[in-house]
């Protein structure tokens, strides 16, 4: 199993980094390509394990898929309608295959998915939404099976709770439904907006993405087209926090400030100088005192849960005692005990973590537990005294495109290695 060896330093992280395309947009867009009857080209797709798994899954369904810079998908040859367990077991996003399959082919089945172990992420909202569009759903032998005679039917759907994943499933399926679908209490994340842009490029008629009411006028078919994936706002935020906690200055290119306004506001509150341009953001912490901030995670445009672990680390290194409340997922403080192994001060009370400040962390052997928490451990290693070993880095590879190379370019000392048995 691969690990990171991180040599800590008091030197600030300084330099420039190019942000990759957003995994959370690239995945639904690749699955949404199932809806098309002609070839599509998707640019700015990050190099990640989940992307590779998705491309393999599309191939298993019969699509022609190749990557040379952009990802090219020809879904016209799809002739299988089942996403099998051996591919799905590592990745929750595979549920996004179900809506497009039943919408275009009248049938689809997906093995109940795996992925990060952060709380309950039931597929109920996906299933309920597809049922309201007229699909018959059954659970058999560990598979979610969907079927419809003829086309799905447009409907007025009010989501029981805000869900990014279910919003994408319903929006994608409704593009080929007969009639108009109105989706109320929809999630508003930038990745949903980007998926809608992609579908509209292929001929869909979607309006209101980015608001809590999305309207989809069903069309009979989708053609081909080209699309570039939106920047990864979480990767952007991760590198900006790395600059802040190390007392450095980092410029992130190929990203936009409007994608993470809540994060930038909290960085400014923490004492950082934040500057933005059309396609870049910089954080400068040189000679500034890091101040703790209070955070409450919330659906977009609130503070993103995927930045919670990074700001937990920030609060541990900052003056004062910051309080972070997690409202999206339960069981999302698994990074806290690992950071405490490095000398951090923090107490968990229910869905809240209260951080104390320490002068400097000490190196330790720590274990990555989920995708975003893992990044906070790597950054902690960069600023700790001594040599930190981060285990189970496959979690990081699921969401960050060459994180060690990008951090090393800023002055970090991170080595990927495989421990011999």
Swiss-Prot record:
Q: Which residues carry this modification: 2-(S-cysteinyl)pyruvic acid O-phosphothioketal?
A: 116
Per UniProt, phosphoenolpyruvate binds at: 23-24
Which CDD domains has this protein been placed in? UdpNAET
Positions of UDP-N-acetyl-alpha-D-glucosamine binding: 92, 121-125, 161-164, 306, 328
* EC code(s) of this entry: 2.5.1.7
An example GO BP is: UDP-N-acetylgalactosamine biosynthetic process
InterPro entries per UniProt: Enolpyruvate_Tfrase_dom (IPR001986), Enolpyruvate_Tfrase_sf (IPR036968), MurA_subfamily (IPR050068), RNA3'P_cycl/enolpyr_Trfase_a/b (IPR013792), UDP_GlcNAc_COvinyl_MurA (IPR005750)
Keyword Transferase annotated? yes
The main location is: cytoplasm
Subcellular location, in the record's words?
A: Cytoplasm
Any one Gene Ontology MF annotation carried by this entry is: UDP-N-acetylglucosamine 1-carboxyvinyltransferase activity
Q: Where is the active site?
A: 116
Q: What is one cellular component GO term in this UniProt entry?
A: cytoplasm
| Reaction(s) the record says it catalyses | phosphoenolpyruvate + UDP-N-acetyl-alpha-D-glucosamine = UDP-N-acetyl-3-O-(1-carboxyvinyl)-alpha-D-glucosamine + phosphate
Function noted in UniProt: Cell wall formation. Adds enolpyruvyl to UDP-N-acetylglucosamine.
Q: What is this protein called?
A: UDP-N-acetylglucosamine 1-carboxyvinyltransferase
From what organism does this protein derive? Answer: Vibrio vulnificus (strain CMCP6)
What is this protein's gene name? murA
